[in-house]
Amino acid sequence: MRVRIIAVGKAKDRDLRSLLGDYYARIERYAKLEEIELKDGKADEVAERLARSIPDRSRVVALEVDGRAIGSRDFAKWLGRAENESVQTVVFLIGGAYGLPQELSKKADLRLSLSAMTLPHRLARLFLAEQIYRAFSILRGEPYDH
C-alpha cells in the first residue's frame, strides 16, 4: 500500500522537517510514503492542483476541523480495512491557511478531525504522520501504542 500526504504549503522549518523525516522513515517500514507539497494560491487553482495529485481509485482522507473525530485505534481499524481491501493508495489532504476546497472535501472517503482545536497546517502534518505510524504499529501488534 502507498500513503500519499498532499499538503498545501511547504514545511520549511528545519526542526519540523527533522521530526517529519523521523515519522516518515518509520511509516516506510509498512508502506511506501510520498509527500507532495503544493503551492498555495487562488482557491480554484489549489483545488485543481490537489485533484491532479490524487491517483485514481485512491481512498481519500480530508483533514477538516469539523471532520469526524476518531481515536487512534479506530483510525488503525480504518487503515487496516484499506489494507485488507487492497487499496493501492491512501491519500491524506491537508489544506492551507483557508482549509481544503469544499468540492474535494465532500468527495473524500473520510473527513477526519485531528483535534477539536484548529491546528496550523504544518503542525497538522506532524500530528498526522505520528498517527499514521501509530496506526500501523497497532495493526502489527507492536508496543508503540500502549
How would you describe each model-predicted region?
Residues M1-H146:
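Post-transcriptional modification and biogenesis factors for structured RNAs
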